[in-house]
Amino acid sequence: MSDAYDGGITVTESAPMDQPIDASAETTAAFVGRALRGPLDTPVLVRTFAEFGRRFGGAWPGSNLGGAVEQFFEHGGRQVYVVRVANNARGAMLCLPAPNGVLVLRAVEPGSAEHIRVAVDYDGIPDDDEELFNLTLQRVAPGSGLVLDQEIYRRLVCEPGRDRSVEDVLVTSSLVRVQGPVPEHRPLATDAGYIDPVQPGTDGQPLSDYDLVGSSADGTGIFALNQVEHIDVLYLPPPGPGRVPGPAAVLAAELYARRRGALLILDPPIEWKRTYEAIKGMRDAGYANPDVLSYFPRVKVRHSEETGALPVGGAIAGLLCKLDRLHGPWEDLDQRGLALNRDYVPAIDIFSSDAHLLVKEGLNVIAGQNPGHTMVCGSVTLAHGTQSGDEFASLTTRRLCLMISNAIDRGTRWAVFETDAAAARERIGRKVHAFMCVLSDAGAFKNDKFVVQCDTGQSRKPVDPERGITLLLACHP
C-alpha cells in the first residue's frame, strides 16, 4: 500500500488452505413437499415460519409441508431448504387484448394462491409510435391485496426477434412467461387498475412418489437439492392427509441421503396404532439403513378437537439442529431442554418392555405423559439389530461420523489444486488433527482418544484428483 494514502482499511486475501476446518457449522435441514405457491423444484432457504408463509403460502390442509416447517422452527431449527414439488399444477393465465388478437401470459409459479395482475400503459412513448408499450406486473397477497413483488418493463414490442421483444424480455421475469403466439399489434392500454387472471391457477393432484423423487437429469424433486452445497437432515413430510411417502420415494430418499452424507427422517405409517403393528411393519418392510431415523408412535395435541395422530418429523429435525448447536451430534436427544412441544403427547402409551422391543427394531420411542416432558428416546438408526451397518446402529455415533466426514470434505477441497503432494498431505494431516482436537475438547470422544493418519511419502507430484489422498481416522464416540 502506498505511503501517500492510507484509507484505514486493509484487505487481506486468505487462501482456503489457511482456514481451519469448521467444527461449529449450523445444521441445515431440507424438506421436500407440496405447497400453495412458490417456485417449483427450486431449493429456497427459509429462516422463519413467517418467511415460509410469505414465499410458499403457509400451512395448508392439502399438505403437511407447512406444518412440518412450523414444527421445525418451534423446536429449535434455524435454517431449512424447502423444495416445492407439484403434480400437474397450473399457473394462472392473463389475457391482454390487442386490436387483432390477444397477448397471453402464464404465471411462472403454479397454484391457486398465486395472484398475478398486469397493467399496460404508453407512458413516455411518442403519440405517433404504435409499437412500443410498457408492462407492469404485480404479485399480490390473497385477501389483503398487498403487493409482494413488482416488475416493470418499458418500451417493449410484440414482434418476435426484435430488440425488446416481449417474448424474449419476459424470459427473465420471475412472475410470468408469454404463452402462444404474440399478436401483431401491441396490447391495448389498461383503462383503470389492473387486469386479473381470466383463468386462476390450480394446485394439481395429490403427490405421487414420482413427484417427490423427481429426475436426476432434470434436477427435479429431491434432486433439486443438488443445487445446495450441503445438507445435514432430509425430510419428506407426508404428501397428503393420511399418507406417507411410498416405497419408491423412501428408497430414492435413502440413497440420496447416503450420497449427500445426510440423515433421512421417516414418519411411521398412520396405520401403526399398536406396538406389535409397528414391529411387524418394520420387519415386513426390511429397512436396514444407518442413515435413516424413524420413530413410534405419532403424537396427539393436548386439548385439541383433532382425533388423528400427527407426525413429528419436522419437530425431530428441529430438535437435531438445536442439539447440535447446544451440545453436539454426539449427544442424545433424550435430555433436558430437548422435549417436544408441551402440547404434544404420545398417541399411545408405551410400556418400558415395549419400548425395548421398538428400539431393537431401530425405532426411536416418543415417550412421556407429563406436560413438557415428551421426549424422543432410543438414539438408534434403522441399522439397529442388523448385520449390515451395525457399527452405526447408534444414532449419536452415526451423526458424529457424518459430521466429521462432511466437515473434512468441505474443509479440504483445496487439496486438488495442490502441486506438491507431500506438502498437501502434511497440511491436511495437521488441519484434521486440529479439527479433531476441537471435537475432543468439546467431549465428542470417550477418553479423549483419536488417531489421524494421512498417507505419507515424499512424492513431489501433484495430487491425483481421481485417487485423492487417503485419510484414516480412528476414534471412540
List the model feature ranges, each with a label:
Residues 1-111, 126-128, 138-143, 220-477:
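Structured, hydrophobic secondary-structure cores that serve as assembly/anchoring elements
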Residues 12, 177-179, 183, 193-196, ...:
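Generic N-terminal simple sequence motifs
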Residues 100-176:
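Extended, Lys/Arg-rich, non-catalytic nucleic-acid recognition/anchoring regions
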Residues 175, 180, 185-189, 400-404:
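Charged, gly/pro-rich, cysteine-poor intrinsically disordered low-complexity regions
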Residues 214-219:
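Phosphate-interacting basic helix/loop segments used at nucleotide- and nucleic-acid interfaces
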